[in-house]
Amino acid sequence: MRERLAAAGLAFYRGAVSPTLHALAPGGCRFQPTCSEYAAIAVAEWGLARGAVMAMWRLLRCHPLSRGGFDPVPLRPKPGGPHLRANGSNFEAKASRREPRSRDAR
């Protein structure tokens, strides 16, 4: 129910508020997908609480000094699969592939 309400609010923003803002300040969005699309995907994929936090973090990254670009919503890890850290690294998988260092190789 709450997710549907959030989706309706985002749809209203994209249909009524966003076009007005872009008419007043042309130039488009810095990011792809747009922040409202990102929020809709994040809420659908991660749920209202986590999706809203992800959307707010995205809004904080949207400022004049940001380069923008492609910034997709992170995918949920598959059950039983390796879990990625926030920066995309996979420490566990990398650690298991490392060869032990000998004491002589410094």
Curated annotation (Swiss-Prot):
Record Pfam families: YidD
UniProtKB keywords: Cell inner membrane, Cell membrane, Membrane
PANTHER family linked: MEMBRANE PROTEIN INSERTION EFFICIENCY FACTOR-RELATED
Family according to the record: Belongs to the UPF0161 family.
Entry's localization field: Cell inner membrane
Topology of the protein relative to the lipid bilayer: Peripheral membrane protein
Species in which this protein is naturally found: Acidobacterium capsulatum (strain ATCC 51196 / DSM 11244 / BCRC 80197 / JCM 7670 / NBRC 15755 / NCIMB 13165 / 161)
Biological role stated in the UniProt entry: Could be involved in insertion of integral membrane proteins into the membrane.
Region span, Disordered: 71-106
Subcellular location, principal: membrane
The protein's name: Putative membrane protein insertion efficiency factor
Gene Ontology CC: one annotated term: plasma membrane
HAMAP family with a match to the protein in the record: UPF0161_YidD
Residue ranges, compositional bias (Basic and acidic residues): 94-106
